[in-house]
Structure formats: structure tokens, C-alpha cells
Amino acid sequence: CRTVGRGKPGAETPANPPQKPARGGPPKPPRTLGRAASRSPKRIVAFVVTGALAVAAVLIGAEVLRVSGDTIEQGDLAAFYVQPDGDVPTEPGTLVRSEQLLGTPIGSQAWRILYSSTDLDGAPVLVSGVVIVPDGKAPADGRTVLAWGHPTTGTDPSCAPSRAFDPFIGIEGMRLMLDRGYAVVATDYLGMGVTTAEGVQAGKDSYLVGETAARSMLDSVRAAQQIDPVEAGDDVVLWGHSQGGQAALFAAQEAPSYAPELTIAAVAVAAPAADLTKLMGSHLDDISGVTIGSYAFPAFAEVYASVPGADLSSILTPAAIEKVPQMNSLCLMSSLTELHDIGQPLIGEFTLHDPTTAEPWATLLRDNSAGGKGIDAPLFVAQGSADELVLPADTAAFVAHEESIGIEVHAVTVPGASHGTIAYESLPELERWLEQHVPTNGGP
């Protein structure tokens, strides 16, 4: 495991990577050309300031246009996510609905999408997400596709990242990937985003259900390939953070059998929820465990309803069963204080038994932990030394396991990075690693 320096955030939000350092050595001394050399310092400063203001005006204008587009799109947002009448296509990855977005990042086009996938029982389901592609010509064999797995945002349909006012802000490294010429697709995962005509969740909740999340990611790539301007090829980079790290790892494991036409060129994860047994065991008696459990146990009880004993009354206390529906309806980022206010009294009173040892929960946690199958691609794993949710020791154990079964792993530890910042702070190292394993597509 390599320890690297922390990434230095630039002027942009953490959804965008730092700027590349200038190449070609130290700057050359300025040349003196004719009358330019006689300009006074004041005139030079005025020229520079005027130029800077002009650039700023362009950037501000572009941002105002983007925000205006976001505002317009919110008006008809709910209608887009209503599941259409009729049967869901049985072919996984079928694009069912798309809508070009107005408020897009500079130098790109984007679409909101609904597409078909498959749940754990093999039934066709609808999933939502977004696709972003840089301006410019794609290679003859199509663009590399970066499939992003988002960290926990909640489980209610309203918590889907693509439904947010700015659906791009949470995609860590999006600007970096667009500049590399990649198409970027970000799934919401099954159970989020899409609703019935009555406004309730369409499809089973799938929080931390690894195989279902994997299918959501892989099928998002297939859907992106059906939008002609995206010009998406078959080469795929999987990149995920926390819950999304688990999704990316499972997608890499399942791709050979579920989506054999796709080539997984590289897999990158930041503080992945790779070992659910250790994750849950580390937080049984704190607010993180209660919050994660309020999302995970209802999802498992719904998805594994046919498994004997996999009902909430077998694992949660009566007090927890009373409060979990309310917690389960709240989104993590927008309702964190409320979630903690509800969950705090449940600390130490949340579960009847230790789910890491009590069946069938112990088996379900193991089955949804990554590492059960190999990955036929190089693997990048980033971990923050100050992460108090996914513990550094647990990630180190996962890395050791992957290396023991012959997987090529590049593991880095970022000093001082927390669980919330590790995906962003690892971007400089991730870019260097991608340079070695996945070529750029030219960029905008």
C-alpha cells in the first residue's frame, strides 16, 4: 500500500479535480517584442485585469446558463421518472427514455436516462441515471465509458442523484474523465429515481445488494451506447466511492457472465464498502451503524423475502422497527441532522442480535461482500488515513485478499483524508494510474 500526498483542491467544487501541473519544466523568461516592452506597468496590469474579467464573464455566463437550465428542468422532473405503461423490456440495458439536459458542464452534452436492468430474481426492472459526454470527435472504435457508482445518498426515489438540482455535482472526477475524452454514465441504482404513477418506489430497494448494483452499473453503459451522440465504445472503466465502491467491485466480478460484450479496462474504488461484515461489525453501537442499518436491513428484508428468517422482526428491536420507516424515507445529505436525531436514541437498542453472527443476516452480509470472485482488470484502491467509517485496516485486509488471488492492485493511502473526501483527494493519483492503464480519447 502506497502513501501519497493529499490532493490539493482547486477553485472548483470537489466534484472536479485539481488542474494538471504545467508540463515542460520551469517557465521561460518573458521575451521583449518591439513596442510592447515600453508599456507601463499600469497599462500591463490594466490589460491583464481586463483579460481576466473577460474570462471571468464568460465562465460566469456559462455557469448562469447551466443553473438556469437546472432550474427549468426541475419543473417537469417528476414526470420523467414515472415508469411507462406496459412491460419493462426484457433485454437488459435497453434505453427506454432519454431527455437531453440544458444545464450541463462546460464543453459537454448530457442526458437523463431510464433503462432496463435485472433484479436479483431475474425480473426486468427500470433504473435511472445520467450520461455526460465531452464535445469533440470520438475515436473510430468509440469512447471509453466511465461508469460511476455513487456513495450513499439514501434509498427513497427522491434521493437519486440524477434527480438533484445539479445531477453532476456528486460525480467525483467527472471533469477529469471528460477531459480524458471519456463518456461518463452515473446510475442511480435500482429502487432509486423511478416511481410508479402513484409516486411510490418502482422496483425493490437494493441498498448494498452487490449483484443488483452491479447490474445497474453495467446496464447503464449499455444504455449509454444507444444514445448516438455519445459514441460509446465497449471499453469500460468502473469507478466508485463507498457504497459505489462495492457496486463497482461487484460489476467487475459479474461483467464476464452478465455483460461479456463489455471490456472492463480498469476498476477504481475509494474507501469501498467491500466487507459488509466488518463494516457493520465496526459500527453496531454508533450512529453510523444505525443510519446504515436503517437503509440496509429494510432493503435486505425486501430483496431476500424468500430467505427464512430474513424479516425485520428477527433482527431489529421493536423501537427500531417503529423508527426505521421514517429514517428510510430520508435522504442522507439533505436530512442528516434529522436522521441523527431519530437514530441517536436507538444506539445500543437497534438490533436484537449481532447481524454479523446471527443467521441469516451473517450469510447475507458475506454474500454481499466483494472478493468472492476474481477481477480480470487492474484495480486501484484509495483509502483515507482519517476515515472513521470504512476503516483503513479493513481496506488493507481487502487489498491483501485481492492480491492473494492474483489481482493486480495499486493501493494508495492519502494522509488525513476522511471518508467524505477520499474520492476527491485521490484524483491526482488516480489520473496517474489511468495514464498507465487506459488511454485518453482525445478530450474536448
How does the language model describe each region?
Residues S206-D228:
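Alpha/beta-hydrolase active-site loop
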Residues P41-A138, E403:
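Catalytic-loop region of hydrolases
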Residues A270-G372:
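Accessory cap/linker subdomain of secreted extracellular hydrolases
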Residues G129, A251, A377-L379, L391-H401:
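Short alpha-helix in the alpha/beta-hydrolase fold that links the catalytic acid
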Residues D119-S128, I132-R180:
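Short, surface-exposed "cap/lid" segments of acyl-processing enzymes
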Residues H353, T357, A362-T363, L389-P444:
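C-terminal catalytic histidine-bearing segment of alpha/beta-hydrolase fold enzymes
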Residues R222-V290:
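Primarily recognizes the serine-hydrolase "nucleophile elbow" in alpha/beta-hydrolase
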Residues I375, F380-D387:
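Short beta-strand/loop motif that positions the catalytic acidic residue
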